[in-house]
Regions:
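Short alpha-helix
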Residues: 193-209, 425-439, 457
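N-terminal auxiliary segments of SAM/dcSAM-dependent transferases
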Residues: 1-24, 267-277
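A short glycine-rich, Lys/Arg-flanked "PGG" loop and its adjoining helix->strand segment in the class I
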Residues: 150-165, 400-412
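Conserved SAM-binding loop and adjacent beta-strand
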Residues: 18-19, 23-56, 294-310
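A short acidic, Gly/Pro-enriched loop at the edge of an enzyme's catalytic core
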Residues: 125-136, 377-387
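Short, glycine-/aromatic-enriched active-site segment of Class I SAM-dependent methyltransferases
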Residues: 171-192, 417-423, 429
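A short SAM/SAH-binding and catalytic strip from SAM-dependent methyltransferases
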Residues: 136-148, 385-399
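Class I SAM-dependent methyltransferase SAM/SAH-binding core
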Residues: 71, 77-126, 324-376
């Protein structure tokens, strides 16, 4: 049975070991891992510069400004917090469970009276701050030591402002079974239990409302870090050096890894999506939403794909007809069509992660990544008997001119179901112009509400 550890155990470990780690890891007291320019050629002298490079990379992705208020979780001796304040002019509040390290951070901060810095001893599972206190939360090499990790993540969500950024790196456990050697040299030595995998971490974050905009598996860099740390520790601490070698073996066996996540606090995912101003951001948001999209929208939105599919079925009874599901997302329309007996459905969406969810439902004969703003080259012209378009032409999404590209894929006499928000349909002049321009006629209008009060309309059109 996995041994249980407490925060008191972790605090005692770091209070006791600070001076030892300074002697070979980083003389300034930071305990981070390196992000290397060239993994194959890195040498021991490259380790500390690689740690600094990782700080610089995280900062580049953070969006910190002079207006930012940052919570640094696991601030240690305060080096990174001070560096962030120096680089950006932001305010940084650092917390750590180690009284020794917080004391070191406070002493170091006195050398920088012009910077907005404060440090205190606190646990991330019970943050002593009010809701929505910070624009950013930053953490490095810390959360694996938190034994109530989901509680900690919910606390981080609580203190972040709406659409605030949480960026962090952490150890992960890629596999579920850990060898006795892995338990001894990794988990028991560092006083923590096997944690999330790369994928389950992202899913848990999203379920809490911390939408993962960017993620990186850094396990190769962790392996190189411990290879070099083994060299650096060998002369003074041969047993520790041997443990680092064992950690490299654990990394090779996928019993240990390292990952990075950049998240955004989002309490209302629908408004978040509609408020997008550029295509790349929209794609990133849908990729972030993919794993929990169905769970979020099942009760209040499912009627839209179901009624859109039925609208097509009313005019296209042939169950073997070729159908294109545009903006297929996680496959809700495909599921609804399959439930009605259709067997030849193709999906297209611009989000890779949404399509991966759709693929697992096994209702499509083919799935393609594509953007309706451009010609869809996976198909020849006039290839489909029916096309369903849901959630594509709306606020913050595709321009109505994309309808021209879809029109080309529909057979003469084919049917096109275009489902829209009523307010978008009635207010978008470009949409009205293109609908009138294309050679088709409206056969039916199906009106309904999503999210209880949001009016929708499904237009059923036939191509001349």
């Amino acid at each position: 049975m996995t041994q249980k550890y407490t925060e008191a155990d972790t605090e005692a470990f770091y209070d006791h070991e600070d001076s030892m780690y300074r002697s070979f890891w980083d003389s300034e007291g930071s305990l981070h891992w390196g992000y290397f320019d060239n993994l194959a050629d890195a040498r021991a002298q490259d380790f500390v510069p690689a740690c600094h490079r990782w700080n610089e990379s995280m900062l580049a992705w953070s969006g910190l400004t002079t207006e930012s208020r940052v919570l640094d979780i696991g601030c240690g001796n305060g080096n990174t917090a001070i560096w962030l304040a120096q680089q950006t002019g932001c305010e940084v509040v650092g917390i750590d469970i180690s009284a020794v390290r917080v004391g070191n951070a406070k002493a170091l901060a006195q050398e920088y009276p012009s910077l907005r810095l404060s440090f205190q001893k606190a646990s991330v599972t019970s943050l002593p701050f009010s809701d929505n206190s910070f624009t950013h939360v930053w953490s490095q090499a810390t959360l694996y030591h938190v034994h109530q990790r989901e509680l900690a993540l919910r606390e981080i969500y609580r203190v972040l402002q709406e659409q605030g950024i949480f960026l962090f790196d952490d150890l992960i456990t890629p596999v579920s079974e850990i060898s006795a050697e892995g338990q001894k040299h990794v988990y028991q030595r560092l006083l923590f239990e096997p944690t999330f995998s790369y994928e389950s971490y992202a899913k848990t974050l999203s379920e809490i409302g911390l939408m993962v905009l960017e993620a990186k598996d850094l396990s190769e860099h962790l392996n190189k870090s411990y290879q070099l740390l083994s060299e650096l520790a060998l002369s003074k601490y041969p047993k520790l050096s041997a443990s680092y070698d064992k950690m490299c073996e654990a990394i090779a066996a996928r019993e240990l890894g390292w990952s990075f996540y950049r998240c955004q606090k989002v309490s209302d995912r629908v408004s978040w999506i509609y408020g997008t101003n550029d295509e790349k951001t929209l794609k990133d948001k849908y990729n972030a939403w993919a794993t929990i999209y169905d769970a979020d929208l099942d009760e209040t939105y499912r009627c839209s794909p179901v009624l859109s599919a039925r609208a097509l079925a009313n005019v296209l009874p042939n169950k073997a007809a070729s159908i294109l599901d545009v903006g297929a997302g996680t496959g809700m329309v495909g599921e609804a069509l399959a439930d009605l007996g259709y067997t030849n459905i193709t999906a297209v969406d611009f989000s890779e992660e949404m399509l991966e969810v759709a693929r697992k439902k096994q209702v499509y004969t083919a799935l393609h990544q594509g953007n309706v703003a451009e010609p869809l080259t996976f198909s020849s012209p006039e290839a489909f008997d029916g096309i369903v378009v849901l959630g594509v032409f709306t606020f913050g999404h595709a321009h109505p001119k994309g309808l021209r590209n879809l029109f080309e894929l529909l057979k003469s006499g084919g049917y096109f179901v275009l489902t829209l928000r009523v307010d978008y349909y009635e207010s978008n002049d470009s949409l009205q112009e293109i609908l009138e321009e294309l050679s088709w006629s409206i056969l039916d209008r199906v009106e309904f509400n999503i999210f209880e009060t949001e009016p929708m309309v499904a237009l059923v059109l036939k191509k001349h």
